[in-house]
Amino acid sequence: MSIVIGADAAGLRLKEVVKDFLEKENFHLVDVTAEGQDFVDVTLAVAAEVNKEEQNLGIVIDAYGAGPFIVATKIKGMVAAEVSDERSAYMTRGHNNSRMITMGAQLVGDELAKNIAKGFVNGKYDGGRHQIRVDMLNKMG
């Protein structure tokens, strides 16, 4: 499993904080950030890498998280969540089988961003009754 991470200019500093934290937690990180990319390009790059392996997860950071979330939900088969708290990050894995989260550097601080990332990457899909919704989401697009 790889954690694919990317950011636009507004999310660069926080991306480095999250990236360093996850590397210290022994996760394999793939950083697809390229200079000058806007959130659309970054989100598409993260999604492309996430979709290479079923177990890959993605994190996109910009100013507010909304833009990358909108982009991610346009990608067939991608279930994503815009999060700004640890519980939502964890639960979106458990109940929605989300493979990507977005967050805003102007909304969350360093420690909260680390906890959001930790909750997301450590979350496990619960399946069961949640699979009906996930199947519905995966048919959209």
UniProtKB/Swiss-Prot annotation:
What does the organism's lineage look like at the top?
Bacteria, Bacillati, Bacillota, Bacilli, Lactobacillales
Matches recorded under HAMAP family: LacA
Q: Which Pfam families match?
A: LacAB_rpiB
State which gene encodes it.
Answer: lacA
Listed as disulfide-bonded, the cysteine pairs are: none
Task: Indicate the enzyme's highest-level EC class.
Answer: isomerase
For the biological process aspect of GO, one term held by this record is: galactose catabolic process
Supply the InterPro entries for this chain.
LacA (IPR004783), RpiB_LacA_LacB (IPR003500), RpiB_LacA_LacB_sf (IPR036569)
Q: Name one GO molecular function term.
A: galactose-6-phosphate isomerase activity
The entry's protein name is: Galactose-6-phosphate isomerase subunit LacA
Give the family this protein belongs to, as stated in its UniProt record.
Answer: Belongs to the LacAB/RpiB family.
State the pathway, as annotated in the record.
Carbohydrate metabolism; D-galactose 6-phosphate degradation; D-tagatose 6-phosphate from D-galactose 6-phosphate: step 1/1
- What assembly does the database describe for this protein? Heteromultimeric protein consisting of LacA and LacB.
Per its UniProt record, what SUPFAM superfamilies does this chain match? Answer: Ribose/Galactose isomerase RpiB/AlsB (SSF89623)
Q: List the catalysed reactions.
A: aldehydo-D-galactose 6-phosphate = keto-D-tagatose 6-phosphate
Tell me which UniProt keywords the record has, alphabetically: Isomerase, Lactose metabolism
